[in-house]
Each structure stands twice: as C-alpha cells, then as structure tokens.
Design a protein with these regions (language model features):
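Amphipathic, Lys/Arg-enriched alpha-helical "gate/interface" segment within cytosolic domains
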Residues: 2-122
Length: 122
C-alpha cells in the first residue's frame, strides 16, 4: 500500500506516504482520514511526504487540491506537511487547496511538525 494511516496517542492523525502515489490513492487517504474524524473534533493532521513520489498529472493535482479543501471534516483542521526537499512535490495541491480555504504548514522535520501540531510553538 502506498500509505499508512493511524491516530497516535497524542490524538494526531498521521498519514505516511511511502511510495509512488497516484490520484486515487491520495483520495483514498483523505477519505480514510475523514472517517476517523469525530463530530466537532478539531483535527490535528500530520502528512508525511518525505518518502513519496508524486504520480499525479498537473490536472489531477489541481483536482485533488479542490477535493481536499472541500472536505467538511477538515474544515478547521490544523495540518502539518513534512517534505524531504526544499521544493515540495505537493506545491500545486497545496496552492489550489489554500485558494479554496485549506491551510497547511510545511516542515522538513517530523519532530518540528509534531511539536507545532501540539502547540509547542507557533
């Protein structure tokens, strides 16, 4: 499987992409995250893209960004993305999602991303 997903003890929902990932796999990950969200929960979501290869076309990235931003369960989510590169392969998705109201903060360190989600720094 191209991704793993779990709710950690600190209540962070963590998605790790391990491989080459296409549009359908990204949508499946979002759908699974939304199923974990409890009504009224302020979601803390950690998306680890440090070992992922993007197989989506530009059109699919734009479509996924819109899909991501349209999920009611993620409307007020606090989202951290971890990438291994200075230039994220996820930049189109994030830009389109941001334009549609979804916000994410990028990190190069898993530890920093977790600390931010837990409110240890702004």
């Amino acid at each position: 499987m191209a991704f793993s997903l779990a709710r950690e003890e600190n209540n962070i929902i963590k998605v790790v992409f391990n491989d080459a990932v296409d549009f359908q796999q990204r949508v499946a990950a979002v759908d699974q995250v939304c199923q974990l969200v409890q009504e009224g929960e302020v979601v803390k979501l950690l998306v680890d893209l440090s070992h992922f290869e993007n197989l989506m076309t530009l059109e699919e990235q734009e479509k996924f960004g819109i899909y991501l931003a349209s999920q009611d369960e993620l409307e007020n989510a606090k989202v951290a993305s971890v990438t291994a590169h200075a230039c994220s392969e996820n930049v189109i998705v994030e830009a389109v999602a941001f334009t549609n109201g979804y916000q994410v903060v990028n990190f190069h360190s898993l530890k920093d991303a977790q600390a931010w989600l837990l409110g240890e720094f702004n």
